[in-house]
């Protein structure tokens, strides 16, 4: 995978793949997507590891993360604006 995040839209909504990026680039890419308003309500992120430092940042911005089924060696989270 290249050293850049990938975005696409599937039947279940928008996706952001940050696998292959070195910390803190995955968190920066995810927060940029939220802060920039690219996704207003929800999207799925694909990561290599559990983003423990991301969770407090999401709470601060009014978002929640829910784990979803993923391939072995992948962490997949559905990020949604808290209601």
Regions inferred by a protein language model and the residue ranges of each:
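A generic structural signal for short, solvent-exposed coil/turn residues
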Residues: 8-10, 37, 57-59, 69-71
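Short, structured protein-protein interaction patches enriched in aromatics and acidic/basic residues
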Residues: 43-64, 69
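Residues that cap or initiate secondary-structure elements
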Residues: 22, 51-53, 71, 83
């Amino acid at each position: 995978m290249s050293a850049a995040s990938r975005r696409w839209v599937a039947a279940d909504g928008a996706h952001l793949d940050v696998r292959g990026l070195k910390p803190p680039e995955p968190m920066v890419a995810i927060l940029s997507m939220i802060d920039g308003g690219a996704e207003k309500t929800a999207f799925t992120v694909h990561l290599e590891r559990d983003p423990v430092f991301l969770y407090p940042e999401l709470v601060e911005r009014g978002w929640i993360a829910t784990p979803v089924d993923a391939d072995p060696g992948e962490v997949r989270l559905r990020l949604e604006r808290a209601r």
